[in-house]
Design a protein with these regions (language model features):
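N-terminal Rossmann-like NAD(P)+-binding domain of SDR-like oxidoreductases, especially those catalyzing
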Residues: 1-214, 381
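C-terminal substrate-binding subdomain of Rossmann-fold SDR/epimerase-dehydratase oxidoreductases
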Residues: 22, 246-382
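A short C-terminal helix-loop "cap" of Rossmann-like NAD(P)-dependent dehydrogenase/epimerase domains
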Residues: 54-66, 160-171, 211, 215-217, ...
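Pocket-edge positions in alpha/beta enzyme catalytic cores
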Residues: 73, 85, 115, 227-234, ...
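Residue-level signal for the nucleotide or nucleotide-sugar donor/cofactor binding architecture
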Residues: 76, 118-121, 179, 233-237, ...
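Short-chain dehydrogenase/reductase
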Residues: 123, 127, 192, 239, ...
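Glycine/proline-rich active-site loop of Rossmann-fold NAD(P)-dependent oxidoreductases
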Residues: 186, 199-201, 211-240, 248-250, ...
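Hydrophobic alpha-helix immediately C-terminal to the catalytic Tyr-X-X-X-Lys motif of short-chain
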Residues: 187-195, 242, 302, 306
Length: 382
């Protein structure tokens, strides 16, 4: 299958491109390399050293004999995107190419506007490119479980059956996003659903949980293929931050009470979910939603697990509750449905102590690269 991976230089996109290439697909990466520029802007970095995209794809070809084509450019530039479609004739378009950080979107007006314009307009361009150049192409779009928020009822997969004043209907599940970033994903979902209805586009919206882990079988082949490990208060997840904090002897900083509960999955499951969606495409005109996660944990749960694992590795990790920079419920109900991908064959890789120890070991190996002041939050929602 001819597959474009947009955002293929990023944390989810890079291992996905390698995995799909290994499975025999003809993979093309489209990326504007802006994720690397965010590091410069924020004076941050990945704990693991990251090779250039050219070095990465060259090493992959050297090791496997498989070629991954690359196009460097922005989805917001429609002429560029159209040319990519004309040259590659994609059968599937995997869309990771969006600004993905809630804190980044909340820095100030400029970052909020950038996040919304970059994400929403880029996604609209993809929809028009499919319509005009590859109408049978299957859009596999990375959404987020954060679109739903934390409602006091079970979270269904995209749609909900409701009864109101004696009438019933199946409607899109209500959205309660918690940042301008999450709002951009909601706008994307609405635009994709509309395009499917009027143009007959086939699309799968993958509402992904928070991704953890470092290596897939492919990235582990050589240090040049290593994936990112972000730990700062803008792009780092709570789990990564706790692991890096324990590696450098810093308190594990839990925001507020720590009862905030979110969905999670291993990076190995991310790449497998993309493959499942590609091999089982949506029907023409269908807007399909899968909740892409395997487990959920509270922030406090994660801190306690990291504390215990760190202790087993001879590290002392103290848990400290700090003021929450976000506007969010710190204790709430959370139960979400995730049956569609399992029904199609997903066999989850769960968050085990061995997984935590593996990431922590890498953090210890590269702890001299950690910029200590970046492990604390710098962005406030208030």
């Amino acid at each position: 299958m001819r597959i474009i991976v947009a955002g293929g230089d990023g944390f989810c996109g890079w291992p996905t491109a390698l995995y799909l290439s290994k499975q025999g697909h003809e993979v093309t990466i489209v990326d504007n390399l802006v994720r690397r520029k965010y590091d410069a802007e924020l004076r941050s970095n990945s704990v693991t050293p990251i090779a250039t995209l050219d070095e990465r794809v060259a090493k992959w070809k050297e090791l496997t004999g498989k070629e991954i084509k690359t196009f460097i450019g922005d989805l917001n530039h429609y002429d560029f995107l159209s040319e990519v479609f004309r040259q590659t004739e994609p059968e599937a378009f995997v869309h990771f190419a969006e600004q993905r950080s809630a804190p980044y979107s909340m820095i100030d007006r400029e970052h909020a506007v950038y996040t919304q314009s970059n994400n929403v307009i880029g996604n609209l361009n993809v929809l028009f490119a499919i319509k005009e150049h590859a109408p049978d192409c299957h859009l596999i779009k990375l959404g987020t479980m954060g679109e739903y928020g934390a409602p006091n009822i079970d979270i269904e997969e995209g749609y909900i059956e409701i009864e109101h004043k004696g009438r019933k209907d199946r409607l899109p599940y209500p959205k309660q996003p918690g940042s301008f970033y999450h709002l951009s994903k909601v706008h994307d979902s609405h635009n994709i659903m509309f395009a499917c209805k009027i143009w007959g586009i086939r699309a799968t919206d993958l509402n992904q949980g928070i991704v953890y882990g470092l290596h897939t079988d492919e990235t582990e082949l050589d240090p040049v293929l290593y994936n990112r490990v972000d730990y700062d208060g803008v792009f780092g997840t709570a789990l990564n931050r706790f692991l890096i904090q324990s590696a450098i002897g810093h308190d594990l900083t839990v925001y507020g009470a720590g009862g905030q509960t979110r969905a999670f999955l291993n990076i190995k499951d991310t790449v497998r979910c993309i493959e499942i969606a590609a091999n089982n495409p949506a029907d023409k005109g269908e807007f399909r939603v899968f909740n892409q996660f395997t487990e959920y944990f509270s922030v406090k749960d994660l801190a306690e697990r990291v504390q215990r694992v760190a202790g087993e590795m001879g590290l002392s990790a103290n848990i400290a509750h700090i003021e929450n920079p976000r506007i969010e419920a710190e204790e709430h109900y959370y139960h979400a449905v995730n049956t569609n991908l399992r029904d199609l064959g997903l066999e989850p890789n769960l968050l085990t102590d061995d997984v935590l120890k593996g990431i922590l070991q890498v953090a210890l190996e590269y702890k001299d690269r950690v910029i200590e002041e970046n492990v604390l939050p710098t962005v406030s929602w208030k």
